[in-house]
């Protein structure tokens, strides 16, 4: 499975797909993260084994990240469109190489209802770093499309940061 940094038309297609999934901007840690300003890692269509010439826009997975807060790189969005095939794991594993030298930590946020994501990240070495009670409630003032209830019928209220030291 090949992970690559998106450029040109592929970057535009990756950002458009993420915006379709998450809306624009992503609201996290009491700030707006415009996906249009993020870099993106991509995995092509894994059913085709990432053959050269993958058509832009046919993604098995995408990871948007920001280097704005050096020495911490922020994962702004992660989507594996082909579940349980190692796509998310491959994207996260490739990220340290792509953020470059001088970065000491990767950080991401998820919501309190996203128990599957919490398990996924912790099994890959990420650790819990912060809890922001009411952060999602505050985010709804900027982005009203955030649902009130999420996975497993849990109310979505809080954000949880996870970090991975490099």
Question: What does each of the following model-derived ranges do?
Answer:
Residues 99-112:
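Conserved GNAT acetyl-CoA-binding A-motif
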Residues 1-3:
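Extreme N-terminal starter segment of soluble prokaryotic enzymes
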Residues 5-83, 89-93, 98, 165:
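Acetyl-CoA-dependent GNAT
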Residues 36, 75, 100, 116, ...:
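Short secondary-structure boundary/hinge segments and terminal tails
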Residues 89, 112-151:
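Conserved active-site alpha-helix within GNAT-family acetyltransferase domains
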Residues 143-166:
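Acidic/histidine-enriched, glycine/proline-rich intrinsically disordered or flexible terminal extensions
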């Amino acid at each position: 499975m090949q992970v690559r940094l998106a450029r040109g038309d592929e970057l535009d297609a990756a950002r458009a797909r993420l915006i379709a999934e998450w809306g624009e901007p992503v609201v996290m840690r009491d700030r707006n993260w415009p996906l249009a300003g993020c870099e993106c890692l991509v995995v092509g269509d894994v059913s085709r084994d990432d053959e050269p010439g993958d058509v832009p826009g046919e993604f098995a997975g995408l990871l948007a990240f920001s280097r704005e807060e050096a020495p911490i790189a922020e994962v702004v969005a992660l989507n594996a469109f082909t579940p349980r095939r190692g796509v998310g794991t491959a994207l996260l594993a490739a990220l340290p190489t792509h953020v470059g030298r001088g970065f000491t930590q990767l950080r991401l946020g998820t919501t309190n209802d996203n128990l599957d994501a919490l398990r996924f990240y912790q099994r890959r070495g990420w650790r819990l770093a912060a809890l922001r009670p009411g952060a999602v409630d505050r985010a709804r003032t900027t982005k009203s499309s955030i649902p009130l209830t999420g996975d497993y019928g849990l109310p979505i209220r809080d954000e949880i940061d996870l970090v991975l030291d490099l």
